[in-house]
């Protein structure tokens, strides 16, 4: 089931701190970032039926993958890709970017 962007954002905000594209330097871990990646048109013989936007959703954390469980439960009814992880170093701390991609119905539909 696809959800609207407003529903996506409301659910994400229930999980903790959420930022679009970049977090402020003062943000405390863990936090979520969502970033627009692309738009698709779902078409039929009568024209465009639905416009769907894709977002990358990232959890930046000093913790472990178990921190993904609340997201998985909150979005259980919405298809999203398997999470991937990229370790990194930030201010001499090991930080992990756990990310997925999710599609939502574009605003105004």
Write out the residue ranges for each language-model feature.
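Small/polar-rich, solvent-exposed N-terminal microdomains that initiate assembly or binding
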Residues: 1-47, 62
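A short beta-turn/loop motif at secondary-structure boundaries
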Residues: 24-27, 49, 89-94
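Short, surface-exposed linear patches
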Residues: 40-42, 54-58, 78-82
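Short intrinsically disordered coil segments
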Residues: 47-52, 72-75
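Compact nucleic-acid interaction/catalytic patches
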Residues: 66
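Acidic-leaning, charged glycine-interspersed low-complexity segments
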Residues: 70-109
